[in-house]
């Protein structure tokens, strides 16, 4: 017998290469090759579905395994015809000729896609063989150790290394009716193929992957909030709900009608942070998709059977053997996970319906045939959707995102966009088609609204700064939320009230015209640009890398010499950790980044890192010196005056210090259990290591002057070995101790220095505090290239003269601010001693190369991403964007938000507070982290570049924007897709309405289809759009300006001003409607001058800042 179609489907080694060749022929050419995934690495037929049941009486049983399904060819029915086999047209996703038994595989792409209706009334014949040998092990992985009594769902992701597979599984508690309260009749139908005495147990002999593979869990099933429970249920199941990865990111908001959900972009992010933070307690998630229904809703439930069953659904993706291909698919999978979960829920609904329906069939063989065919159909639809999402051609350079990413060719980009924009206005707006399309897009894709909010700046500055938002950037650091979630919500326009999810499809046979429309719309479909931070754990560092000495702490049990008890011995080993380079290192540093001649510590002393501590902690008692600060990155809030820790404190100790420059040491803070190296020994070691040739410039250091402008360093983590209190809980006591020590340092000193400081306007701006000016040992800031000639003028240090020291501080500040003025009073001794100090600092034994904690000053402009860390003194160069010292995560430099008035005030207050009292600044020195590398490259690993697609061969449901040549599949699938979007929203928050904008360039019509309104006319997909006069006048004015040959950036600024005008009109409308319950449209026209055709647009805009407007007018 010739190999069956299903055998070819699942025979990976035999068919993967040829199926890749077949798939290559069926694909449309990419619009930007670098902006999609390689389809040859992904075979959609290698997606496997397993349905498992766990019953407290009958144990675990496999209800379905797609690997065990084989198609029985109906030779008699199709002997003379060479037509494609149709597994309900949904499973195949393509065509394969039956007559040639050697035909390699089904082609990857069918013209009708994955949702066409049944081509044949009669069910295809399937043979369900014995499930594969690995199902027992996979069942163990799916169910895990969750108790049967636990209600709610759990979701897990496993990566199986051999063969490489990615498994996503979701376990539901079964909900059953009384008369049909089991799947026994379905299971009995399977008994002749599924009987296995070992089912329900992990049979390692049958386990093709070996017993050890069960431990390959990625541990992604993070416990989150418990579902709300009824009164009759027990409350002590002892497990947190673990429903979905995206439920960690996405939780419910207040109801759309409440005023607290006035969903501005900023407020949505703040709410997301509140609802996902464990500090705020557990907020129940919505209960849909939590249970698996095994009976129709009309069945009455039987309480005795409530806890008896769990159903697990698992999707397994077989990965390519190549590592790069595996990495590509994993990138795709995890960056698009909310979409995967949404489609998995849709698959679950289809399985529920199949199970319920098949019970009504009396004959066992027909029941199995019906059940298997329905599941294969649903699996085929899932495969097709994932394939489409993976292989769709993307728009290479979306206009708004490319403008935001700080491209150097911004002017050319503006010119190209304006050229395309005005061409469309001239060509396709004669019958108001383009104006209608833009009206619909601005009405439903509302993420543009926060970008045009006024930002108290002159227009030209407002335009250049619109890319970024300080307040959102600060929010992302202080109240973390998932930026992918924020980006997805912005793209779908889900920031109004009530919440709508919107997609736009442009239909037309003229491919060039459709592509041009899609390109122009990417300016109005706005979202955040994401900056990705990646950790590189590699110990091998490149030639130009700066290295920090990290520490590896090893604990071991050793028996005591006298007592019989055992002691925990902590060993600290220094290991290098890479740090992203701030500025190019000098030649000396590049060839010898670390001193190699530091002598070994004598036996008996603990070899610890010599960390630098801020002066605030300099007087700490030795017992408190065990804080782990091995290679601290100085927080910008820390004072820049330094003392040797526990070695030279106070004037009387200065007398004991050696009289050369070596007395100014970095603090000898010890990392470990409290032992200290002898201070004199440290001095001796450091004197041995005085460099013969001083480097040209010292290592990078934060500019003191810039501290006045940057945000406070908010997230510092200090590990204290042997300390039970968290750093936060110890904060107040440490503050008190510090204040006492400040007072003890000498009031007269404070007074004299304050007088000196007041005499010099430069010094008065200094963040340094009187009382910390003693024993200054501060390396000079690395300045920009032009300042190298003056780099030796810095902190002169003279024990006898306080005035000179204050003047030196002023001089240093003037350099750091690039003022170009000469240093005030930095004498020759100062320069000489500074050299000695710098030499000590650079060559300190195992001393860390200090790197400033990322300043995070947001230099908002065309070349920089918000939240970028700008190296000090290097403003004119291109900066390396990265985040150090934080837990690496994507940071949202939110395009969809300009500073609104109150936010601008808030950030101004933060900046004011920064230049004021610095006593509450950061006390901790950060531990070295592995290299955190920020990636600002344009890729499709975020929704902004992935869901804005080009001209596709068929309609695709997930995409925010795409074009297609035919609306045939659109008509078939649109209604079901809109309903699915409402029931299984990818944002996982309650959605009031799902909307699809359909622009047909063949019929010159723009319609809006919605999940709420049924269309009575069969010829139409939705309601026609009412063209806004505001949008029409905007298009005409842009066209006139362009024809007058005004500069492109001026035209775009005018466009932004007109959009802002719409926003301000919506504010006016909301203010007028405040307190009203009903208002007549004519009244609005008379009082506010708002035309009736502008009302839908202005109402939608107003819903982003005033939710009550929609309730009054809709």
UniProtKB/Swiss-Prot annotation:
Keyword DNA damage on this protein? yes
| Ranges where the dDENN FNIP1/2-type domain occurs | 1050-1105
What changing residue 146 to D does, per the record, is: Abolished GTPase activation (GAP) activity of FLCN
Start and end residues of each cDENN FNIP1/2-type domain: 468-1040
Q: Please describe the organ and tissue distribution of this protein's expression.
A: Widely expressed with highest levels in muscle, nasal mucosa, salivary gland, uvula, fat, liver, heart, placenta and pancreas. Moderately expressed in the lung, small intestine, kidney and brain. Lower levels detected in renal cell carcinoma than in normal kidney tissue. Higher levels detected in oncocytoma tumors than in normal kidney. Higher levels detected in renal cell carcinoma tumors than in normal kidney tissue.
Record keywords, A-Z? Cytoplasm, DNA damage, Lysosome, Membrane, Phosphoprotein
The record's GO CC annotations read: centriolar satellite; cytoplasm; cytosol; FNIP-folliculin RagC/D GAP; lysosomal membrane
Q: Name one Pfam family in it.
A: FNIP_C
Select a single GO molecular function from the record's annotations and give it. Answer: protein-folding chaperone binding
For the modification Phosphoserine, the affected residues are 216, 221, 723, 726
The segments labelled Disordered in the record are: 12-32, 93-126, 203-237, 585-632, 645-665, 747-800, 875-900
List where Basic and acidic residues composition bias occurs. Answer: 605-624, 791-800, 875-892
Q: Name one GO biological process term.
A: intrinsic apoptotic signaling pathway in response to DNA damage
Sequence segments annotated as region (Interaction with PRKAA1) = 544-911
Q: Which residues form the uDENN FNIP1/2-type domain?
A: 42-460
- Biased-composition ranges, Low complexity, are 13-27, 94-116
**Quaternary structure?**
Homodimer and homomultimer. Heterodimer and heteromultimer with FNIP1. Interacts (via C-terminus) with FLCN (via C-terminus). Phosphorylated FLCN is preferentially bound. Component of the lysosomal folliculin complex (LFC), composed of FLCN, FNIP1 (or FNIP2), RagA/RRAGA or RagB/RRAGB GDP-bound, RagC/RRAGC or RagD/RRAGD GTP-bound, and Ragulator. Interacts with PRKAA1, PRKAB1 and PRKAG1 subunits of 5'-AMP-activated protein kinase. Interacts with HSP70, HSP90AA1, STIP1, PTGES3, CDC37, BRAF, GCR and CDK4.
This chain's function reads: Binding partner of the GTPase-activating protein FLCN: involved in the cellular response to amino acid availability by regulating the non-canonical mTORC1 signaling cascade controlling the MiT/TFE factors TFEB and TFE3. Required to promote FLCN recruitment to lysosomes and interaction with Rag GTPases, leading to activation of the non-canonical mTORC1 signaling.
Which family is annotated?
A: Belongs to the FNIP family.
The protein depicted here goes by the name: Folliculin-interacting protein 2
Q: Which organism is it from?
A: Homo sapiens (Human)
């Amino acid at each position: 017998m010739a190999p069956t179609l299903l055998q070819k489907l699942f025979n990976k080694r035999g068919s993967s290469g040829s199926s890749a060749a077949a798939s290559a022929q069926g694909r449309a050419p990419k619009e930007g090759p670098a902006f999609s995934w390689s389809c040859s690495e992904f075979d959609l037929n290698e997606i496997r579905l397993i349905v498992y049941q766990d019953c407290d009486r009958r144990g675990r049983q496999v209800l379905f395994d797609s690997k065990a399904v084989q198609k029985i060819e109906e030779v008699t029915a199709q002997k003379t015809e060479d037509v494609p086999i149709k597994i309900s047209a949904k499973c195949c996703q393509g065509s394969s000729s039956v007559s040639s038994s050697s035909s390699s595989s089904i082609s990857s792409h069918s013209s009708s896609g994955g949702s066409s209706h049944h081509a044949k009334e009669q069910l295809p014949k399937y043979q369900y063989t014995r499930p594969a040998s690995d199902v027992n092990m996979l069942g163990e992985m799916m169910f895990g150790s969750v108790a049967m009594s636990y209600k709610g769902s759990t979701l897990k992701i496993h990566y199986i290394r051999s063969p490489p597979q990615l498994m996503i599984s979701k376990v539901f508690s079964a909900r059953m009716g009384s008369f049909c309260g089991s799947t026994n009749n379905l299971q009995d139908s399977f008994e002749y193929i599924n009987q296995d005495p070992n089912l329900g147990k992990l049979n390692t002999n049958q386990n093709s992957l070996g017993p050890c593979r069960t431990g390959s869990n990625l541990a992604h099933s993070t416990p989150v909030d418990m579902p709300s429970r009824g009164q009759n249920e027990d409350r002590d199941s002892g497990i947190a709900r673990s429903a979905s990865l995206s439920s960690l990111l996405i939780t419910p908001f207040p109801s759309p009608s409440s005023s607290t959900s006035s969903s501005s972009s900023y407020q949505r992010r703040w709410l997301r942070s509140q609802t996902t933070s464990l500090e705020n307690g557990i907020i129940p998630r919505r209960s849909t998709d939590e249970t698996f229904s095994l009976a129709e809703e009309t069945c009455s439930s039987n309480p005795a059977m409530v806890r008896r069953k769990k159903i697990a659904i698992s999707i397994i993706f077989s990965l390519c053997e190549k590592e790069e291909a595996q990495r590509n698919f994993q990138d795709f999978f995890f960056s698009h996970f909310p979409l995967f979960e949404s489609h998995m829920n849709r698959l679950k609904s289809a399985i529920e319906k199949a199970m319920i329906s098949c019970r009504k069939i009396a004959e066992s063989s027909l029941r199995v045939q019906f059940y298997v065919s329905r599941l294969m159909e649903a699996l085929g639809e899932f495969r097709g959707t994932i394939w489409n999402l993976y292989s769709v051609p993307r728009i290479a350079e979306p206009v708004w995102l490319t403008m935001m990413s700080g491209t150097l060719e911004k002017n050319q980009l503006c010119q190209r966009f304006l050229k395309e924009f005005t061409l469309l206005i001239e060509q396709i707006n004669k019958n108001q088609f383009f104006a209608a399309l833009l009206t619909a897009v601005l009405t439903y894709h509302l993420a543009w609204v926060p970008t045009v909010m006024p930002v108290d700046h002159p227009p030209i500055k407002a335009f250049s700064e619109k890319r970024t938002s300080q307040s959102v950037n600060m929010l992302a650091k202080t109240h973390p939320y998932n930026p992918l979630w924020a980006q997805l919500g912005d793209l779908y326009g889900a920031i109004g009230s009530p919440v709508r999810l919107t997609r736009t499809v442009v239909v037309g046979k003229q491919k060039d015209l459709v592509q041009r429309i899609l390109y122009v719309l990417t300016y109005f479909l706005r979202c955040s640009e994401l900056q990705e931070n990646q950790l590189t754990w590699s110990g091998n560092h490149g030639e130009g890398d700066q290295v920090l000495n990290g520490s590896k702490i090893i604990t071991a049990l050793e028996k005591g010499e006298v007592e019989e008890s055992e002691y925990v011995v902590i060993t600290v080993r220094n290991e290098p950790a890479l740090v992203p380079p701030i500025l190019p290192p000098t030649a000396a540093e590049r060839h010898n980044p670390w001193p190699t001649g530091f002598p070994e510590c004598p036996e008996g002393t603990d070899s610890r890192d010599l960390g630098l501590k801020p002066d605030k902690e300099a007087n700490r008692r030795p017992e408190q010196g065990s804080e782990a600060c091995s290679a601290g990155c100085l927080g910008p809030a820390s004072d820049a005056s330094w003392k040797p820790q526990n070695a030279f404190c106070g004037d009387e100790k200065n007398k004991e210090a050696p009289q050369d420059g070596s007395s100014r040491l970095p603090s000898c803070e010890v990392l470990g259990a409290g032992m200290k190296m002898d201070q004199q020994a440290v001095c001796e070691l450091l004197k041995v290591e005085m460099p013969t040739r001083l480097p040209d410039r010292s290592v990078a250091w934060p500019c003191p002057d810039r501290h006045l402008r940057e945000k406070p360093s908010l997230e510092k983590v200090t590990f204290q070995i042997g300390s039970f209190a968290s750093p936060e809980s110890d904060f107040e006591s440490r503050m008190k101790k510090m204040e006492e020590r400040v007072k003890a340092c000498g009031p007269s000193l404070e007074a004299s220095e304050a007088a000196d400081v007041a005499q010099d306007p430069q010094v008065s701006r200094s963040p340094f505090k009187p009382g910390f000016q003693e024993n200054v040992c501060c390396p000079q800031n690395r300045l920009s290239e032009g300042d190298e000639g003056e780099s030796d003028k810095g902190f002169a240090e003279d024990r006898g003269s306080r005035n000179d020291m204050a003047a030196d501080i002023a001089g240093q500040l003037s350099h750091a601010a690039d003022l170009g003025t000469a240093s005030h009073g930095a004498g020759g001794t100062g320069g000489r001693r500074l050299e000695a100090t710098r030499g000590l600092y650079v060559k300190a034994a195992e001393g860390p190369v200090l790197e400033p904690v990322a300043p995070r000053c947001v230099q908002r402009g065309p070349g920089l991403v918000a939240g970028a860390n700008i190296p000090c003194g290097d403003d004119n160069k291109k900066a390396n964007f990265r985040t150090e010292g934080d837990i690496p995560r994507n940071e949202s430099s939110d395009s969809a938000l300009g500073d609104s008035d109150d936010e601008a005030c808030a950030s101004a207050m933060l900046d004011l507070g920064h230049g004021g009292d610095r006593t509450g600044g950061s006390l901790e020195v950060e531990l070295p982290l592995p290299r955190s590398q920020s990636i600002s490259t344009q890729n499709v690993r975020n929704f902004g570049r992935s869901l804005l697609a080009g001209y596709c061969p068929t309609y695709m449901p997930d995409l925010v924007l795409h074009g297609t040549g035919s609306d045939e599949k659109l008509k078939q699938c649109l209604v079901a897709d809109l309903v699915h979007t409402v029931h299984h929203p990818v944002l996982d928050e309650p959605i009031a309405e799902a909307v699809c904008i359909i622009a047909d360039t063949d019929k010159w019509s723009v319609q809006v289809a919605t999940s709420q309104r049924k269309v009575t006319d069969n010829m139409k997909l939705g309601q026609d759009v009412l063209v806004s006069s505001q949008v029409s006048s905007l298009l005409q004015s842009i066209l006139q300006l362009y024809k007058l040959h005004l500069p492109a950036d001026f035209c775009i600024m005018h466009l932004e001003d007109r959009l802002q005008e719409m926003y301000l009109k919506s504010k006016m409308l909301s203010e007028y409607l405040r307190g009203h319950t009903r208002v007549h449209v004519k009244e609005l026209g008379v009082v506010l001058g708002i035309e009736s055709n502008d009302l839908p647009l202005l109402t939608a805009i107003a819903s982003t800042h005033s939710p009550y407007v929609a309730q009054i007018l809709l």
